[in-house]
Amino acid sequence: MISIITPAFNEAANLRSLHTRIVDAMTKLGVTWEWIVIDDHSRDETFAVLQQLSAGDPRVRGVRLARNSGSHVAIACGMHLAAGDAVIMMAGDLQDPPETIGAMLDRWSRGAQVVWAVRRSRPGDRSHASLAAIYYWIVRRVVGLRDMPATGADFFLADRRVVDAFRAFPERTTSVFNQLTWIGFRQEYVEYDKQPRAAGASGWTLARKIRLVIDSVTAFSNAPLRWCAYIGAGMLVVALALAVAGVALLPELGGGILLVLAVLFGVSGVQMLALATVGEYVWSALAEARRRPQYVIEVSTAETGDLAGTVNTVK
């Protein structure tokens, strides 16, 4: 069986069309499948649509989270619930065409354990594409996950062994895609053309993008801490040079107080930046140490085994 999981936030206008296309694609492939949609506490009729789809198609399962937790938490929830031999994650906005699933399953049948659908083209404004390019450069060069596709990938297939390994991860403040890249196994790629959003607006705000960058770096890399050490060492060298210059030259020059203030503000700024960097790591460690549940399920469309109130557990 193939499990398809979809995080959804205010996607009521897209889910019926996506369901139709998934049914068509999977019927042509002739495989058994289930579709698990995780409603990330939407403000529209997303869960009502899921109830209707589930009533007409028992392969559809809707789960509503008790609070808005972000797409990566919703994806993790879906991977915890999926029962398939392979799990496919695709967006709910029709930007990831279900017709690509056939190529992904072909790679899986030939031994690939993670299959990334890599974008050949990306619709949307250039600013969004530029931010995405910067993020994936950071992931590859700073975080050190060089197997991450340069153009990024958020449409993937994971084998059951990979999913089981992912479930053992205790981290809460990180990226599912980064975890799957780090986890290893045999990873391959297929290309596709990302489609324009069919309806609605993306909930992927600039603030969430920045948060994802910070979480990705603090979860996988100590590079910022080393940068702080290098900058601090460099500033000590500069301070020593300024002290020597001050003793030798400033009695003959005016404006010495301005130089002192400039150095003071510069040093203070670097200290605050270093403190903030360390603080991010401390906060990330504290968030993990609390061991709060990553998500809580408010209600499910499942006819048996109601999941209401279910939380994920970490062994």
Q: Language model features by range: what are they?
A:
Residues 175-315:
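Hydrophobic helical membrane-anchoring modules
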Residues 1-125, 314:
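Structured catalytic core of nucleotide-sugar glycosyltransferases
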Residues 7, 65-67, 156, 229, ...:
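Short conserved micro-motifs on helix faces and helix-strand junctions that flank
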Residues 26, 112, 142, 146, ...:
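A general structural signal marking secondary-structure boundaries and capping sites
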Residues 63-81, 95-174, 179, 195-214:
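Acceptor/aglycone-binding surface of glycosyltransferases and processive sugar-polymer synthases
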Residues 56, 84-85, 110-111, 169, ...:
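Structured helix-beta-strand junction loops
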